Amino acid sequence: MRRLLALFVLVASINLAFAEEWMVRRQVGSSFTDTRDAIVTAVENRGIVINYTARIADMLERTGADIGATRKIFDQAETVEFCSASLSRKMMESSPHYIVLCPFTISIYTLPGDTRGTWVAFRKPQGRAARMVEGLLREIAAEAGPEIRSK
């Protein structure tokens, strides 16, 4: 019985360790607006065009009543969507299946009751694409401001 319990604890801890490895998130000490503007500037300074900005918090607030949801998930939340033509082409020449990684996105959000700062997060690419794309995403996210917490 002890071995079974130990095995269960081991498996559970491994699952927790890998549960969020697909995502990189960091909290910065600046306001939502300043953080979002820093991300937008970082993208545009690299000559990359922003395709779309999804206003996630507004959408959830607007549609929540329609489905009976009352919990506020974000104070503010936006996802910036962009694409680097050269990087995307290189990535998809390596494997056309990497199309699922394009466009690239970085999310900026604040949580209710958390006054310490703003979160910046992005999906962590896997495989060969990670070597091509993750550096760009990390550089852009780093320009949001000094990190106060990461995961």
Locate predicted features:
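Extracytoplasmic
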Residues: 21, 51, 75-77, 101, ...
